[in-house]
From Swiss-Prot:
Cofactor: FMNH2
Source organism: Flavobacterium johnsoniae (strain ATCC 17061 / DSM 2064 / JCM 8514 / BCRC 14874 / CCUG 350202 / NBRC 14942 / NCIMB 11054 / UW101)
One of the Pfam families matching this protein, by short name: Chorismate_synt
Catalytic activity reported: 5-O-(1-carboxyvinyl)-3-phosphoshikimate = chorismate + phosphate
Protein name: Chorismate synthase
Record note on cofactor: Reduced FMN (FMNH(2)).
């Protein structure tokens, strides 16, 4: 199976399955001499880990990171950083009923067809548990770029939207509620909606918005390696993501050029920022902002038709511990992937 690595100079490879012994990763290209804040890494992991509230999966995992290489006396050595995250709370029996069956809208069928064999326990390699390794790599990338501030938050759950412009939000309130929405009133409505969906044995999707501030001018490469193209690739690689838009996004297609152009100030900043901080695929120094759409979790606690490996349509009811809505736990994953992309382009920029 290829496709387990991301990046050019700051290169991240992840490994492991949801119900295997451990997850893990290798970070290649991290500069030497970075004094790591291990507590900050733990904070990022705790934001993503399961079992943190009543509106996420109740699988309990400490997600304790064990670093194996690339760090000495608390500093990066410049050699590959290897780490593992032990799995401690697997319940593989919850998945015995899908050993010979393919769950609707999961990767079960395509994995079996492509590889001729699959780990059906918890989705195996296709499980969102893989993203724990990305959060480790993203936490280190954030410490490479301390001046850059990355804040993601939940801006919609199902039909409930937070329409307040990000400039008017207090990002310090993102972690004040389990939904990770910085508007308390909207967060309460979203949380109640998720609880109701869970009671119905169903799931719901949502949108995570992300704002990146203090980005220097010049990150990104023209043509095929544009900054927004790499951000889009990184976000679309996250489990359950169905869409990505930055700046004015699709709404920009309804505007006139005279309305959409970002006019300059004498210092090179722009009066508006419909470009989303990126022009010609290169950061322009303005805030980068984008939105990531997540589908509803495919496993629902209702009976639906399934397909078995003999070609028979069979009824199936979801079992196990699953998120009724992924977006609260997706917030740190979106931040991590954004940090990885920026760290990679930062190192590429130093080659000029």
């Amino acid at each position: 199976m290829a496709g387990n690595s991301y990046g050019t100079l700051y290169k991240v490879t992840t490994f492991g399955e949801s119900h295997g012994e451990a997850l893990g990763g290798i970070i290649d290209g991290c500069p030497s001499g970075i004094e790591l804040d291990f507590e900050a890494i733990e904070v990022e992991m705790s934001r993503r880990k399961p079992g943190q509230s009543a509106i996420v999966t109740q699988r309990k995992e400490p997600d304790a990171v064990q670093f194996l290489s690339g760090i000495f006396e608390g500093k990066t050595t410049g050699t590959p950083i290897g780490f593992i995250i032990p799995n401690t709370n697997q319940k593989s029996d919850d998945y015995s009923h899908i050993k010979d069956n393919y769950r609707p809208s999961h990767a079960d069928y395509v994995y079996d067809q492509k590889y001729g064999f699959r780990d059906y326990r918890g989705g195996g390699r296709s499980s969102a548990r893989e993203t724990a390794s990305r959060v480790v790599a993203g936490a280190i990338a954030k410490q490479m770029l301390p001046e850059i501030k990355i804040n993601a938050y939940v801006s919609s759950v199902g039909p409930i939207h937070l329409d307040t412009p990000y400039q008017d939000l207090d990002f310090s309130k993102i972690e004040s509620n389990p939904v990770r929405c910085p508007d308390e009133k909207s967060a309460a409505i979203m949380e109640e909606y998720i609880r109701d969906i869970r009671k119905q044995g169903d799931t719901v999707g949502g949108v995570v918005s992300c704002v990146i501030q203090n980005v220097p001018v010049g990150l990104g490469e023209p043509v095929f390696d544009k900054l927004h193209a790499e951000l889009g690739k990184a976000m679309l690689s996250i489990n359950a993501v169905k869409g990505f838009e930055y700046g004015s996004g699709f709404s920009g297609s309804e505007m006139k050029g005279s309305e959409h152009n970002d006019l300059y100030n004498p210092d090179g900043t722009t009066k508006t920022n419909l470009s989303g901080g990126i022009q010609g695929g290169i950061s322009n120094g303005m805030d980068i902002y984008f939105r990531v759409a997540f589908k509803p979790v495919a496993t629902i606690m209702q009976t639906q038709d399934s397909l078995d490996n003999k070609g028979n349509i069979t009824p199936m009811t979801g079992k196990g511990r699953h998120d009724p809505c992924v977006v609260p736990r997706a917030v740190p994953i979106v931040e991590a992937m954004a940090a990885i992309v920026l760290a990679d382009f930062y190192l590429i920029n130093k080659t000029y």
